[in-house]
Amino acid sequence: MATSDQDRRHRVTRNRPPIARPSTSSSRPVVSPPRSKVSKRVLLRVASVACGIQFGWALQLSLLTPYVQELGIPHAWASVIWLCGPLSGLFVQPLVGHSSDRCTSKYGRRRPFIVAGAVAISISVMVIGHAADIGWAFGDREGKIKPRAIVAFVLGFWILDVANNMTQGPCRALLADLTENDNRRTRVANGYFSLFMAVGNVLGYATGSYNGWYKIFTFTKTVACNVECANLKSAFYIDVVFIAITTILSVSAAHEVPLASLASEAHGQTSGTDEAFLSEIFGTFRYFPGNVWIILLVTALTWIGWFPFILFDTDWMGREIYGGEPNIGTSYSAGVSMGALGLMLNSVFLGITSVLMEKLCRKWGAGFVWGISNILMAICFLGMIITSFVASHLGYIGHEQPPASIVFAAVLIFTILGIPLAITYSVPYALISIRIESLGLGQGLSLGVLNLAIVIPQVIVSVGSGPWDQLFGGGNSPALAVGAATGFIGGIVAILALPRTRIQKPIPLP
């Protein structure tokens, strides 16, 4: 970071009154023992778990909103199923971050949480994949609504959201620990994380777009589980293997130094943990410097923009481009598969952008890059609205397949959105890790603070997007319009309010 930025942060720290903290020893920031700089290869292996996490997340994003509608939940309420994601992020992510900052396990602070999260992910996707079979075993039969299968699905879905938050946060915190507040190394590590997210997305969306898994895993098709269900189940079997491989690669690469359980700090530690946690995460807000609040504001606006797309991307393709409905004909499932293909191409662009991230931020400044990416996101959402409008007036819906030009436009928009998505997955985490270090927070808790700016908007979108869309006659365009507006505003704020610092070319990493 440039000298002027360092001086600014030091002045804020010097003029700020001391942060009031509980008297318990657990509230004191955890300081890791000094270590030598880790190599890029180690950072790469540690970040690899993001590939396994994102593989399952890609399946979740591309297939589960359509699938839950096939189980009988109306489109207007499908977004409510996703409510657990932001709710678990609101509570689980900060709690896990706080706990991992103070974990005294002999295996390290972060790795136990990564492994536990990976196990929970594996269990949850098995429950989701077998939801129809579980529902059948407990009395579901043929019908439009399968209530017992829905209960099993929602249970597995919510466990999956909790597990994703339990795994991803400690992994990012571990990368921050290993880079030891080196600005460039932090950006590089987050770039690696985004790169592996892109690889996981490509593989996950490719898996979700293939309709022949039930022919390979023939046992997955049952009396309760049709072809679409069997393909989903098969994809999750692959996910379990993939998450196991990447978790082993990640945790075996990081050599964490366990925290010493000092007898002098033992007194009162267990009794004051919750109080200290709440005090740290909320009590420090008023001491944040202005640029931290700008980062949190832009993050919130960005995610109000992204979440409607994340919820309904393949559903938008199936309904508004292919003109289908769940459980009626083949148009909807064909649209979902094409949407998954578009998301796979999206992930290719995400990966390319992740590789170029460091150079872009060094040349133009992280705030400027973030702002431009948000404006690009808003333009793409506007393009989706225009494409839906044109498709609805061509007269093919309900009679024939969409014209190639409409499909091409939709897939192109999905693809281009990979560029701003890569920025969203990387730049805010790097900025927040660097800028609030002076507050004395551990990396796990600092990322939990940023997570609040992500999940609160997601709660709002999850609750409001379905009724909001119905207010304007259904479809996904109203929520996308809100996303375009907030994304554009966030981009302007980032460009104008975040320092456009150009970083000098650094010495190559070892």
UniProtKB/Swiss-Prot annotation:
GO terms for cellular component: cis-Golgi network; plant-type vacuole membrane; plasma membrane; vacuole. CDD domains: MFS_SLC45_SUC. Residues 1-34 are annotated as: Disordered. It is a multi-pass membrane protein. One of its GO terms (molecular function) is sucrose transmembrane transporter activity. Keywords: Cell membrane, Membrane, Phosphoprotein, Sugar transport, Symport, Transmembrane, Transmembrane helix, Transport. It is found in: Cell membrane. Optimum pH is 4-5. The chain crosses the membrane at residues 46-66, 72-92, 112-132, 149-169, 188-208, 234-254, 292-312, 336-356, 366-386, 403-423, 444-464, 478-498. Pathway: Glycan biosynthesis; sucrose metabolism. The modification Phosphoserine is found at residue 23. The keyword Cell division does not apply. It catalyses: sucrose(out) + H(+)(out) = sucrose(in) + H(+)(in). Homodimer. Interacts with SUC2 and SUC3. Belongs to the glycoside-pentoside-hexuronide (GPH) cation symporter transporter (TC 2.A.2.4) family. This is Sucrose transport protein SUC4. The gene is SUC4.
